[in-house]
């Protein structure tokens, strides 16, 4: 089954993406705690705004990182993990 890049991700209610100076990186805050994101996840997370679909997020990152092999597949994988962990909703 292929991933539907026309879906628009948004953070679930109660989840907030932000830079956390104490962690020296981006985190995802939620009522029960916090998840520190790696640099790649932070770049993707910074583009999740409830407006852009996955295809637009991929296009934006392809502009920033031209020639990176399998970039689209990596972003799809992040979206699948984030959805499975209930961080995002895809509509």
UniProtKB/Swiss-Prot annotation:
- The source's domain of life comes to Bacteria
Q: Which InterPro entries match?
A: PQQD, PqqD_bac, PqqD_sf
**Is Lipoprotein found in the keyword set?**
no
Give UniProt keywords alphabetically.
PQQ biosynthesis
Give the GO molecular function terms.
quinone binding
Q: Which GO terms describe its biological process?
A: pyrroloquinoline quinone biosynthetic process
Pathway connected to this protein: Cofactor biosynthesis; pyrroloquinoline quinone biosynthesis
List the HAMAP family.
Answer: PQQ_syn_PqqD (MF_00655)
The subunit field of the Swiss-Prot or TrEMBL record says: Monomer. Interacts with PqqE.
What family is this protein classified in?
Belongs to the PqqD family.
Function comment: Functions as a PqqA binding protein and presents PqqA to PqqE, in the pyrroloquinoline quinone (PQQ) biosynthetic pathway.
Q: What is this protein called?
A: PqqA binding protein
Organism equals Pseudomonas fluorescens (strain ATCC BAA-477 / NRRL B-23932 / Pf-5)
């Amino acid at each position: 089954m292929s991933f539907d890049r026309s879906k628009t991700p948004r953070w679930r209610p109660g989840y907030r993406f932000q830079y956390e100076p104490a962690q020296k990186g981006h985190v995802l805050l939620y009522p029960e705690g916090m998840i520190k994101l790696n640099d790649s996840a932070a770049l993707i997370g910074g583009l999740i705004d409830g407006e852009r679909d996955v295809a637009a997020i991929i296009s934006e990152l392809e502009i920033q990182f031209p020639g990176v092999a399998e970039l689209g597949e990596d972003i799809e994988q992040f979206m699948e993990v984030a959805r499975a962990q209930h961080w995002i909703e895809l509509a």
